[in-house]
Amino acid sequence: MPEVRALSAALRRGLDLWVRPEVRPESATSAIGAVQASPVCYVLERRSAVDLAALENLCIREGLPRPSGRILGRRQSAVHAAIPLLRARGIFDPRIDRRPPAELVRMIEVLERDSTIDVRLVPIAVYWGRAPQKEGSWWRLLFTENWALASGFRKLMQVLINGRFTMIEVGEPVSLRSLLLESGSPALQAARIARAQRAAFRRQRAARIGPDLSHRRTILHRVLSARAVRAAMAAEMRDKKLPRRRALMVAKGYLEEIAANYSHVFITFMEGFLGRLWNRLYDGVTFNHAETLRDVAQDREVVFVPCHRSHMDYLLLSYVIYKQGYAVPHIAAGINLNIPIVGRFLRKGGAFFIRRSFAGNALYTAVFMKYLAAIMARGHSIEYFVEGGRSRTGRLLQPKTGMISMTVRSHLRDPRRPVVFVPVYFGYERIVEAGTYVGELSGQPKRKESIGDLVRALRVLREKFGRVHVNVGEPIPLDEVLQQQGGDERRAELDEEGRAPWVSAVVDDLAQRIMRNINSAAAVTPINLLAVTLLAMPRQSMAESDLARQCELYLKLLRMAPYDARVTVTDLDGAAVIAYGESMKVLQRQTHKLGDLVRVSDEMAVLLTYYRNNVLHLFTLPSLIACAFISNSVVRTEDIQRLAWRVYPYVASELFLKWTEQELPGVMRRLLDALAELGILERLEEQDAWRRPAPSSPQSLQLSLLAQASVQTIERYYLAIATLMHAGSGALTARELSERCQLTAQRINMIYGFNSPEFSDRAMFDNFISLLLRRRVIRNDEAGRLVFDEVFLRVAADAEFVLSEQIRHSILQVTQVESIAQS
């Protein structure tokens, strides 16, 4: 009708003056252009004249087929080139009409009559007020995109207020003929295709604006009605002699303690607030490998598994995900953060709370498991920290597998969508908890969080914390891990809670992969380089020229022999790294006629161990090679390879290194070649050996400093070995050995003044002893005491090979003193 066309044209011209949509993905229009040989039909998520006009303007601007046209015929027999899926039944009837669009039925009828014709369906979703890179306002919050079908008035307000903050999501063109089955009427085929498209739009909308919260009470009711929860309630009633109502109230109390209270309005408000906060605290937030997120977000249940450095981790990851155009994930937060004011805000931001331990509380376990299963079933992305708590040392902690286990079991019970784990690495140049961490690194007990901590934290708003790097690691599809572990063939062994003996192996494997992939996405900042270099010096002081030269060496090594393609490295050169360290107040300069010296304070030296440990895994193998030359001027390749083979399993377990033992020889050869090219080793071809530089050369100093990155790790291993050897086979239990090693390490720390608190960390010794047992280097006798044989003595000999005589003598001397004190 001419009147309708005139109104549509007027609406389109009005929108063209005001609306500035962002198109996602950027390559979408070229993908549509590539399939114009077939008729194109745009499938809109919702019926809206405004949405259609916005799409029309986009197509005109990009030279694409227009949605206002017709396809598959002429005049009355033609089909509209745009069909909406969700539409109200009438002007005064807001209920959704779920019948398949008549145009879709007619298209299928045409395709069935003529086998030479095909139609390309292009899904289109328009989000008014969901362009994530723009800051929010209260008016925009009121009329931002949500899950309800908008009334005419609301749509008008959305256009007026959010017109410049609009996103058009264009799906991949798909052949309609490829979606048809051999049997079924056109109406049934259309209904099936429409259902699938609506489901895809729901998943896409959840990924973009967050979950549909209109059914939160339904989710909570479903959790409390679950058979496993009811069974746990019955056990609670029986064991504690509680009436049914009281047991129900206990379960409901647990659920209220756990559950998030996700708010779209709060999320949008926090985007603007956090944007201003980051600008005040940081010099920028860099999000690397964002394309990975785009690849996995659609049609998968995404589980973000970041490392845990700071309380800022919660906010930063949610912020960068939201800025990429995706919904904020539901975050598993420790119950210690459920404090007044803060806890309420975190719930509105998607946090659900988890106790440190479920032991002995079957009802709480059942409620939590069912809540996790419910939010996963609804397609919400989730996030949790597999380390359990924040790392105080800068190293990745050994993973806690509880949440991973519950995620795996939930998927095994109800595998609705593929699950993919997305590791995330946080690289801070300075952490806001620096003062607290220095105290804890120096031996002070960990403090419990309180509202007072929040007030004290406001003081940091006056300080600068450099740049933050958020790097996305290689995703890990759960189905891939299950297949490798033979899980697909063993699902019949699962009980109704998803438990089976083989599931533990899957969980452990998955946990280790996550930690390795986090480390494989590390960010190397100027502060990391300064920490690795200066902590190698006894007094944390160097000539400026030597410091710049060493930083340059590390930068070249990281680029010539990269640890992983996802590792990011600062673009600064050595001199600029020093200047940056001074601007961050990390370095102190001492002027001298023979050349300036650069140093750090004692307190800063303790904190720098944190930043060194963030990237220590990147330097471990090159440093291990350098260790071989501490007491040897020439070393054969086979001796270096044997040393690496002997030590690698222990450093790989401690630092979550990425390579298998089978890959190790090739990795060591590449590193040796890189070190030779950098001039700090000389290749002796005829002897198949390597020679260190002349002792008086700058390269000799560089090699010695590189060795220091891992020498304390080797010293710690040798300390444990020497302690056990001195005590004798069958003399100590694993616990007694660990305690004695810790005391000895503390004494060495006091005598030699190491600025390395983790050197005497009991957990490090526990992990090393446990790995010695698993690898059968030592064994437990019938009394539970440790016994060893020639294999252990060969490990000890290799440890001696890389340590200087002075270091070995010092360790043996302190070990003997400690042994006498214990006897």
Task: For each feature predicted by the language model, list its residue ranges.
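Membrane-interfacial terminal anchoring regions of lipid-handling membrane enzymes
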Residues: M1-S823
